[in-house]
Curated annotation (Swiss-Prot):
Entry-linked InterPro entries: Fmt, Formyl_trans_C, Formyl_trans_C_sf, Formyl_transf_N, Formyl_transf_N_sf, Formyl_transferase-like_C_sf, GART_AS, Met-tRNA-FMT_C
UniProt entry tagged with the keyword tRNA processing: no
Role summary: Attaches a formyl group to the free amino group of methionyl-tRNA(fMet). The formyl group appears to play a dual role in the initiator identity of N-formylmethionyl-tRNA by promoting its recognition by IF2 and preventing the misappropriation of this tRNA by the elongation apparatus.
Chain coiled-coil ranges: none
Keywords: Protein biosynthesis, Transferase
Organism whose genome encodes this protein: Bordetella pertussis (strain Tohama I / ATCC BAA-589 / NCTC 13251)
Residues engaged in binding (6S)-5,6,7,8-tetrahydrofolate: S117, L118, L119, P120
Family named by the database record: Belongs to the Fmt family.
Gene Ontology CC terms, in alphabetical order: cytosol
Pfam family of the protein (one): Formyl_trans_N
Record-linked SUPFAM superfamilies: FMT C-terminal domain-like, Formyltransferase
MF GO annotations: methionyl-tRNA formyltransferase activity
UniProt EC number: 2.1.2.9
Protein name according to UniProt: Methionyl-tRNA formyltransferase
C-alpha cells in the first residue's frame, strides 16, 4: 500500500520501521522541524527524520499544515508534496501538529492514527503517563480513523496491554510502541482486503490525558503514598518526579520509589528513616520509600549510595 507517514518521536519511529519492514511504499514522511537538543543545544533531527533519511525517503518538516495559519507557504508546499505522491492512506503517530480537514480528506482511505490507549479512555497528549498515574491495570493501542476531533474517530483495531505493578512510563512506552507498530501493519493488511469495520467510540468511559507539565513533577507529600509512587513511575523519565530533602538546596529527582502500607507517624514530608534500605517519607496516607535518586547536576544513584553523602 502507498502511504505517507507523519510522526516525530521514538514511538513513531518504531511504527515507521514496522511499516517499511512489511513492504509498504512510503514515498514521503512528515515530521516536526529539527529542535535544539543536548548540552550544546545543537539542532537535532527527530527519530522519524533520521529513520526516513536512512531509508532514502523524502522528508517534509512544515511548522504548520494550516493554509490560513502562521506559515501558509510551508503548509501549501506540504500539500503539494502530498498531492504529488497521491497516498492511499496517511499513518499518523505522535506527529505533534494538528491535521486540518484538507489533510484528512486527501488520502484515498483517509488518515489512520496509532493512539497509545484503549479509546475512549485517555484521549489526548499523555495517555501512557496518565494511565500509570491513575493506577489502571491495563492500557493498549488503538488504530483509529482520524476525524476533526481530539482522538474521537472510529476505532478500527485495539490491542490490550497489561500495566506491570512497577512498570515506568519509559518501559510501557517501549512496549506500546512495539505493539503499535504491529497493530498498524495488521490494520493496513485487513484494510486492503476490506476486512476492517470501523466502530464508533462509546460515549461512556471517556477520559482525557492532559499534557504533562513540569510543575507536576514536585511530589505533594500530603497525598497518599500509593498515589505518589504511581507518579514516580508515570513521570519517569519526563518530567521526572522530584522531592525536597532537608540539607539540600535543590529538589532531588526520584527515579524509583515504593509505597509502604504503614502508618506515617509524622508530618507529611518528614523523613522518618534514611539508610541503605531506603529513605522513608511520611505522606498523607502511608509511607513513601525512596529507592533511587539524583541530586541536581549529579548522577542517578541507588539509595544506599545516595545516603552515604547525605543525612537529614
Amino acid at each position: 500500500m502507498r502511504l505517507v507517514f507523519a510522526g516525530t518521536p521514538e514511538f513513531a519511529r518504531i511504527a515507521l520501521d514496522a511499516l517499511l519492514a512489511a513492504g509498504h511504499d512510503v514515498p514521503l514522511v512528515l515530521t516536526q522541524p529539527d529542535r535544539p537538543a543536548g548540552r550544546g543545544l545543537k539542532l537535532t533531527p527527530s527519530p522519524v527524520k533520521q529513520a526516513a533519511l536512512a531509508a532514502g525517503i523524502e522528508v517534509a518538516q512544515p511548522r504548520s499544515l494550516r493554509l490560513d495559519g502562521r506559515y501558509p507557504d510551508e503548509a501549501a508546499a506540504a500539500r503539494a508534496q502530498l498531492e504529488r505522491v497521491a497516498p492511499d492512506v496517511m499513518v499518523v503517530a505522535a506527529y505533534g501538529l494538528i491535521l486540518p480537514q484538507w489533510t484528512l480528506d486527501l488520502p484515498r482511505l483517509g488518515c489512520l492514527n496509532i493512539h497509545a490507549s484503549l479509546l475512549p479512555r485517555w484521549r489526548g497528549a499523555a495517555p501512557i503517563q496518565r494511565a500509570i498515574e491513575a493506577g489502571d491495570a491495563e492500557t493498549g493501542v488503538t488504530i483509529m480513523q482520524m476525524d476533526a476531533g481530539l482522538d474521537t474517530g472510529d476505532m478500527l483495531l485495539e490491542r490490550a496491554v497489561p500495566i506491570g505493578a512497577q512498570q515506568t512510563a519509559a518501559q510501557l512506552h517501549d512496549e506500546l510502541a512495539r505493539v503499535g507498530g504491529q497493530a498498524i501493519v495488521d490494520a493496513l493488511a485487513a484494510l486492503a482486503q476490506g476486512g476492517l469495520a470501523p466502530r464508533r467510540q462509546p460515549d461512556a468511559g471517556v477520559t482525557y490525558a492532559a499534557k504533562l507539565y513540569k510543575a507536576e513533577a514536585a511530589l505533594d507529600c500530603s497525598l497518599p503514598a500509593a498515589v505518589l509512587a504511581r507518579r514516580v513511575r508515570a513521570f519517569n523519565p519526563v518530567p521526572g518526579a522530584t522531592i525536597r530533602l532537608p540539607g539540600l538546596d535543590d529538589p532531588v529527582k526520584v527515579w524509583r520509589a515504593q509505597a509502604l502500607e504503614q502508618a506515617a507517624g509524622g508530618t507529611s514530608g518528614a523523613v522518618l528513616r534514611a539508610d541503605a534500605q531506603g529513605i522513608d517519607i511520611a505522606t498523607g496516607q502511608g509511607v513513601l520509600r525512596l529507592l533511587e535518586l539524583q541530586k541536581a547536576g549529579g548522577k542517578r544513584q541507588p539509595v544506599d549510595v545516595f545516603v552515604r553523602g547525605w543525612q537529614p
